[in-house]
Amino acid sequence: RSGNAETLDRHAKPHWELAEEMDLIDFELGAKVTGAGFPFYKGKGAKLQRGLIQFFLQKADEAGYTEYIPPLMINAESGFGTGQLPDKEGQMYHVTADDLYLIPTAEVPATNIFRDVLLQENDLPKTLTAYTPCFRREAGSYGAHVRGLNRLHQFDKVEILRVEHPSKSYEALDGMVEHVKSILEELKLPYRILKLCTGDLGFTSALTYDFEVFST
């Protein structure tokens, strides 16, 4: 499925060229200060980033999601609780002195709110949203030569999460897909939705849809 294809300029410049020309993002400065995959957002680029985060959070609030600001680090028990450990341990930043991990997505601490908690059916659904910086090592050769904002080691993300009765889980997923679609439609961004094949599914996933938004 796709949408807003009519807004796509076939001769559009890559986003990294636009970011440089408009002085929105400085990739070289990030590489100097930290390393590749840690860009600086500046001026209007920083304002745009902050504005989009607030826009996404506001849309989630209007849809009934409760906002959380979770910790940016988790313990090993939380990593195992959502399947990041041991499956993706090599992709996570590990602070060995304290045996804590930087989160790869807000989903991890948000989901662990309900770890070891017995929920009654009439307590459901639980709907959460959270904005956090996210950290991923992206170890290995895959994505090593991509440019711009792809495969970053640090990036910002607004997450939506629903805890549902198993019999309603796929229906809930469809509702979340429609929520994201409505935001992209409002922003008039060209996008497509991919249903991942079994071999590409995450360790803990039964069904995954990827949204791809045009950026060249």
Task: Specify the residue positions occupied by each region the protein language model found.
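TRNA-recognition modules of translation machinery and tRNA-sensing kinases, especially anticodon-binding
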Residues: 4-216
